[in-house]
A protein has these predicted regions:
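Hydrophobic face of amphipathic alpha-helices that form TPR/SEL1-like repeat modules
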Residues: 1-29, 55
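Glycine-rich loop-to-alpha-helix module at the N-terminal edge of alpha/beta enzyme cores
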Residues: 30, 34-124
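Residue-level signal for inorganic ion chemistry
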Residues: 30-31, 70, 92, 114, ...
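Conserved C-terminal structural/oligomerization subdomain of aldehyde/semialdehyde dehydrogenase
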Residues: 32-35, 226, 263, 318, ...
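Short, well-ordered beta-strand elements within core beta-sheets of diverse protein domains
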Residues: 34-40, 54-61, 152, 262-265, ...
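Structural signal for hydrophobic packing residues in well-ordered secondary-structure cores
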Residues: 56, 60, 78-85, 89, ...
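Rossmann-like NAD(P) dinucleotide-binding subdomain of oxidoreductase/dehydrogenase enzymes
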Residues: 126-272, 402
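ALDH superfamily catalytic-core signature
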Residues: 228, 236-382, 445, 491-492
Length: 492
């Protein structure tokens, strides 16, 4: 029988006020219900808000002089997660679908992120300077203060690492956090939020509500007490939240869609580029990543060789249940995502694209009840195919010939998105030209799409607003207050 999980309110798991639940199924076998979670609504969000406001008013957590103490709590949380990493990784794979080694990597990302932000304890310092106003001497101080109650809206693709990107800096800054996980992958986030309280976060500072976006989600983004919203999601969802936030002049951090391009030059290590793009760039997490490689522009004089290398690497990937040791790529997370990916593939083929690897649903008893797709590689994809212009959130990789770097950059910049980008080249001149001209928030050079706590993460154009990770990610959760104090008359 499936385990019943609760929302987290005041440090405890509680049911929804209406008492309803909904199932979370295993995307590798939809007959398996991994857990039942509360179907929260507007009133559940309101009581979570009241709980958080009470905690901000009556606990030590938001005090500007307690940052070292908060840092110790975050470090303790990272240690608790590390002790349960294998258990949590298996739960993550069962609810999300990704292979176990990727789930372990995601838990490592969370641990590293909380460890990184814990190091800001005692370092949230302001400034002091002196100036004069006529005959008066003025002491000018600044201090960093928490925003207050913040909301995190999480996606299904990386429910653990993106939890850390939002929750760790928000808590380090002294805020309270109201967390809404994705309905298809909320279970690990529920356990993590319970563990925050075990680590020493006061009751009410980290609450979690599960439920539909149409009710719980809407109340969350429109409630006047919520002062900041952090979302990872689609561009359309981000624009909706941005408009709602504007009504209350709320702070926002929006990490939205991406159609990340990679340019492969003729002086690149083609074998390394092909292996990295396939194994770490496009098909990791079944292609369900904002920063996965979604468009590849290859110099024409090496296109045939490179496309063969990519197709060979893709054909080697073993699709299956993420808990099985031999699996390289698990299922997609849900039926709608698979249908959307199949549409992109069908559209490209209808317009004349050539499939050189994979494609379609794998056959066999082990695949019948899961959301599986074979990794697909396409060449000769017409420029009007939808996959060049919209985000395909799954395992399809289109390759296009370009004459030179200039055309490659032009094609790369033709998308409305501007999240990540990459170049493979042995030429410093080419690399610097790409870095200077590419319209993207991030660039990877001869490497996989890597996210690390020390480096700010975010995009331009339709890929979002604000930055997560790094010192910039912490600044998104702080207000600056300035104090002008008269201290006496200036000497003449």
């Amino acid at each position: 029988m499936a385990e019943t999980f609760g929302m987290i309110l005041d440090g405890r798991q509680v049911p929804a006020l209406e008492g309803e639940t909904f199932p979370v199924v295993n995307p590798a076998n939809t007959d398996e219900v991994v857990g039942l979670v509360p179907r929260g609504g507007r009133e559940d969000v309101r009581r979570a808000v009241d709980s958080a406001l009470n905690a901000l008013e009556n606990t030590w957590w938001p005090k500007i002089y307690e940052s070292r103490r908060r840092g110790r709590v975050l470090q303790r949380f990272a240690e608790l997660v590390d002790a349960r990493k294998e258990e949590l990784a298996r739960l993550l794979t069962r609810e999300q679908g990704k292979v176990l080694k990727e789930s372990i990597g995601e838990l490592d990302s969370l641990i590293n992120t909380f460890d990184y932000y814990s190091g800001f304890g005692g370092k949230l310092t302001g400034t002091v300077t002196y100036t004069r106003d006529g005959e008066s001497v003025i002491k000018v101080e600044t201090r960093k203060e928490p925003i207050g109650l913040c909301a995190a809206i999480l996606p299904f693709n990386f429910p653990v690492s993106l939890y850390a990107w939002k929750v760790a800096p928000a808590l380090m800054a002294g805020n309270a956090m109201l967390i809404k996980p994705a309905s298809t992958a909320p279970l690990t986030d529920i356990v993590l939020t319970q563990m925050l309280h075990e680590a020493g976060v006061p009751a009410g500072i980290a609450n979690l509500v599960t439920g539909p976006a149409s009710s719980a989600g809407e109340e969350l983004i429109r409630h006047p007490a919520v002062k900041k919203i952090a979302l990872t999601g689609s561009t359309s969802t981000g624009k909706h939240i941005y408009a709602a936030a504007a009504e209350g002049l709320k702070h926002v951090t929006l990490e939205l869609g991406g159609a990340d391009p990679t340019v492969v030059c003729d002086d690149a290590d083609l074998a390394a580029a092909a292996e990295t793009i396939v194994r770490s760039g496009r098909f990791r997490n079944a292609g369900q990543s904002c920063t996965s490689v979604k468009r590849v522009y290859v110099f024409a004089n090496v296109f045939d060789e490179f496309s063969r290398l990519v197709a060979d690497q893709a054909d080697r990937l073993r699709v299956g249940n993420g808990l099985e040791a031999m699996t390289d790529m698990g299922p997609l997370n849900n039926a709608q995502v698979r249908e959307d990916v199949e549409h992109f593939l069908a559209d490209a083929l209808h317009r004349g694209a050539v499939l050189v690897a994979g494609g379609g649903r794998p056959e066999g008893a082990g695949y019948a009840k899961g959301y599986f797709l074979r990794p697909a590689v396409l060449i000769d994809v017409p420029p009007d195919a939808e996959i060049w212009h919209e985000e395909c959130f799954g395992p399809v990789l289109p390759l296009m010939k370009v004459r030179d770097l200039d055309e490659g950059i032009e094609k790369a910049n033709s998308s409305p998105y501007g999240l990540g980008s990459a170049i493979w080249s042995d030429s410093d001149r080419r690399i610097e030209e790409f870095v200077d001209r590419i319209q993207a928030g991030m660039v990877w050079v001869n490497y996989k799409p890597l996210s690390i706590p020390e480096a700010p993460f975010g995009g331009v154009k339709d890929s979002g607003i604000g930055r997560e990770l790094g010192a910039e990610g912490l600044a998104e959760y702080l207000e600056t207050k300035s104090i002008r104090r008269y201290v006496g008359k200036a000497l003449s």
